Amino acid sequence: MPADSPGTPGRNYPFFATDIVLGNYAYVEEEFSFEGQANTYSIKPGTNAETLTSGTAYRSRMLVRRPATQTRFNGVVVVEWLNVTNGYDTDVLWLYQKEFLIREGYAWVGVSAQSVGVSRPPNGLRVWSPSRYGRLDVDGQGKVPGDALGYDIYAQAGAAVRKVPAVLGGLEARLVIAAGQSQSAGRLATYLNSIHHRDPVYDAALLTVNAATLRTDLTIPVIKVLSENEANSSRSQADSERIRTWTVAGATHSEQYSLLSRAAFLLRDLNLQAVDACDTPARSRVEIRYVYNAAVDSLVKWRRASIAPPNAPDLKFSGDILQRDDHRNALGGVRSIEMDVPVAHDAAINCGLGGTHVPFDDQTLSRLYPTHADYVGKVRNSAARLVKAGFMLKADADLAVANAERSIYGERLVCGPLCADVRQFPSHPSSILLAKQTAHLLIKDGSTLVALVDRATRAIAEGDTLGNDPRSKKKFAEAAAHLRSYVSKTQQFLAGGKVARESAALLIEQATTLITLVEARTK
């Protein structure tokens, strides 16, 4: 499907087209419509489905992000059942895993398989862009309820990855992994339990933040990665020959990375801001995405080389009560760095699926980490343990350690509201949030931008530490200067094609807001 540039008025471009300049990483994004005929099924839990009807015509679309050349391609395709919980198609797992997928040479395909994402007002594809998507039909022109055609639509999309050369631009798929997040993972679990055996398309599957029970006689390996939100149900199914369940302590169903990763294109395509409306500071900072990455890597090794992934410890319960430490963080489960080397209370409590993130006070941080080197060393050791255990990849561990080295933990600096990692823009502008937003957009040479914000963070913290000392004004002036340099450099990156227009606009707006607030502290 030919496309105009994302953000153009006619909306002749893919819905939620990526806000990454993929060409900088030798990747491309393409969208295809595809059509066929689908069955509906009688589905009973734990049994093979029976065909109810056959031959219903459909027309859907798939969004493909892939290496531009065979040399960049690792031969593995992740096919994501797009999530429609918010009333529109969302590429949730791509958002979490894009850095890993691009780094390691995966292809990714997102499939529209449900009528909410295709037809429901106000943001279904057909409503959002009638000229581009008006012919799509995944519910038999409204006559087939319950997304009953979706299973065959998803299966046939997976088959097309292998059988239709145009889908991958001539690249050869050697392994195809099914993937779904939350609601989509529930649909995928039903497909795996009852339908996939009829015409096996997928070689492995990743189900995230949905604890649906799977049949133990499945013929493909499956890993379920769960957060604290699904903790009770995660204990209902033990690991088996082809199934693993990894529950991540402190992680939440939808956390900060998920929110920041969609901020630019959400504003571009729907004029919506990715914000929270929670009384208690929300959005866990536990990096569940690193466990997702390890799960995909493990599935590939499991399928290709029969190397079984590790069994993960369960979260610790007393009856139905999740046990917590003195910081109110969960005990047991996959121990993320954020749980092993905590700087905050992170949990699934509070605000629906967003959970909680409440930073420790300065006294607690100073007691836990007397020096910056102490903090970084503990992060490094935790990352090494996770890599050895199989729940984190070495490249992600290196990134986590680098982030620790960039931080100011252990330096006995006061990080006030203008630099604190709490809540979100625009309700809580802060330099650390700006640095995270910048990093999450995968800007080519984006470390240059992040470094400028880090300098601003340090200057703000030094100013906060000085308190009413007149020298604090100089520190805030330094911070404002670093942020102005950031804006200038972002504009240069936009002109040079390193950052997408919508991403640059978001970052410049956030930085400008922060500059105004920081400059007020120089008066």
Task: Please state what every model-predicted region is.
Residues 1-423, 495:
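C-terminal His-loop and adjacent cap/lid subdomain of alpha/beta-hydrolase
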Residues 351-523:
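Soluble extracellular-acting proteins and domains
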